[in-house]
A protein has these predicted regions:
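N-terminal Rossmann NAD(P)H-binding glycine-rich loop of SDR-like oxidoreductase domains
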Residues: 2-22
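Short glycine-/acidic-enriched loop or helix-start segments at secondary-structure transitions
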Residues: 13-15, 20, 38-39, 83-85, ...
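Glycine-rich phosphate-binding loop and adjoining beta1-alpha1-beta2 segment
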Residues: 28-56
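Active-site loop/turn elements of alpha/beta-hydrolase fold enzymes
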Residues: 32, 77, 116
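NAD(P)H-binding glycine-rich loop region in Rossmannoid oxidoreductase-like domains
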Residues: 44, 53-54, 58-92, 121-122
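Conserved Rossmann-fold NAD(P)-dependent oxidoreductase catalytic core, especially the SDR/UDP-sugar
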Residues: 71-74, 99-126
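Conserved active-site region of classical short-chain dehydrogenase/reductase
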Residues: 94-98
């Protein structure tokens, strides 16, 4: 089984589509469906189950996530360049990523993490 976090976002849904194209439907998707576009991104995609991000994180932290996971593709982060809530960024981007990476390392599961240009800013400072 493959886990894709942020699966209903633009890039995550493209990853899910590609996994489907190569025959992978054993995908557990994770996201927070907080706007009308995200469910549309999942239309016609194949996956075995959906977890809300908070529920998924609770599963990971409590040791309930199946060890049948072969890979976590982690796209679940806030990439907004205008949001200024430091606590939210820390919990959603840093702590969430750290928890998943530690679980993957402990369970010998491949962990793929991708970032965006939002990490680096608009280039005004070099």
């Amino acid at each position: 089984m493959i886990v894709v976090t942020g699966a209903a976002g633009f890039i995550g849904s493209c990853i899910l589509a590609r996994l489907n194209e190569i025959g992978r439907k054993d995908v557990l998707i994770v996201d927070h469906l907080n706007n009308e576009l995200k469910p549309k991104n999942l239309k016609n995609k194949k996956f075995i189950d959906y977890f809300d991000k908070k529920d998924f994180l609770a599963h990971v932290e409590s040791g309930q996530l199946s060890t049948d996971v072969e890979c976590i593709i982690h796209m679940g982060a806030c990439s907004s360049t205008i949001l200024t809530d430091e606590k939210y960024y820390n919990e959603n981007n840093f702590e969430y990523t750290k928890t998943l990476a530690q679980w993957a390392l402990k369970n010998n599961v491949r962990f793929i993490y991708a970032s965006s240009a939002a990490t680096y800013g608009d280039g005004a400072n070099g």
